[in-house]
A protein has these predicted regions:
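Acidic, polar low-complexity intrinsically disordered regions
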Residues: 39-126
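Low-complexity or membrane-interfacial segments used for flexible interactions
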Residues: 1-46, 51, 55, 110-113, ...
Length: 189
C-alpha cells in the first residue's frame, strides 16, 4: 500500500465501492473515476461512464431545446442544466440554485484558479503547473492536502476522479457540471 497520497492519481482501476456508483480508481485509494467519452461532437453531447465502462450519466444539447445543455442520470432523469446565454446560467436540482456560471466557478483575481462554492463550503479548481490539461480541486483553506478531485484530459476523453471525501461531501454532481463548463470551449464569464 502506497503512503504517497498523490500516487493513486496514476493507478489502475479497482472494484466497486459504493454499489450503484462506478468502481474506484484503485482498490486501496477509494478514488472514483468517471470518463467523459463518445463526444458528439464535444463534451456538450457525450456519455459519462464509470471506470468499468458502464454509462452513468449523459450530457446532451438537444436541438429541441436550443441554447441548453442538460446533464442526466443513467435513468434519463435530469439533474443539471446549463443555459448558454451571453452570461451562461447553471442549476443543479435540489443543491445549486440557478446562478451565473461565473458565480458557480468564480475566476480568481490572478486568473489562475476558479472558486466553486457548494453547500456553503468553498473549493478551488487549480490547473497544475507543467501538467497540460490537469486541474485539481482543493478545499479553499486546505493548503497542501491531497486534492479532492482531479480533471484530466487524456486523448479525446476527459477523466474525472473523486476522493471518498468528495463523494461524501456531495461534490459528484457539481464536479460533473464543472467538467462540462471548463471543457465546453465557451466563455463562462
Amino acid at each position: 500500500m502506497s503512503v504517497n497520497p498523490f500516487s493513486a492519481w496514476n493507478s489502475g482501476m479497482g472494484g466497486n465501492i459504493y454499489g450503484a456508483l462506478p468502481g474506484s480508481g484503485s482498490a486501496s485509494s477509494g478514488l472514483m473515476t468517471f470518463v467523459f467519452t463518445s463526444f458528439n461532437p464535444n463534451v456538450l453531447n457525450c456519455t459519462v461512464a464509470g471506470s468499468n465502462g458502464q454509462p452513468h450519466f449523459q450530457v446532451s444539447s438537444d436541438a429541441s431545446m436550443p441554447g441548453f445543455t442538460v446533464l442526466k442520470r443513467s435513468d434519463g432523469r435530469p439533474f443539471g442544466v446549463i443555459e448558454w446565454r451571453s452570461h451562461p446560467v447553471i442549476e443543479i436540482k435540489d443543491s445549486v440554485k440557478k446562478q451565473f456560471a461565473s458565480q458557480f466557478l468564480q475566476l480568481s483575481r490572478d486568473q489562475r484558479s476558479r472558486k466553486m462554492t457548494f453547500d456553503r463550503r468553498e473549493y478551488n479548481w487549480v490547473p497544475q503547473p507543467n501538467q497540460v490539461d490537469i486541474i485539481w480541486l482543493h478545499r479553499e483553506s486546505s493548503g497542501q492536502t491531497p486534492p479532492l478531485a482531479r480533471i484530466a484530459k487524456s486523448g479525446r476523453d476527459i477523466h474525472l476522479e473523486l476522493s471518498p471525501e468528495a463523494i461524501q461531501a456531495g461534490l459528484l454532481q457539481p464536479c460533473l457540471l464543472s467538467v462540462v463548463l471548463l471543457h465546453s470551449g465557451k466563455s463562462i464569464d
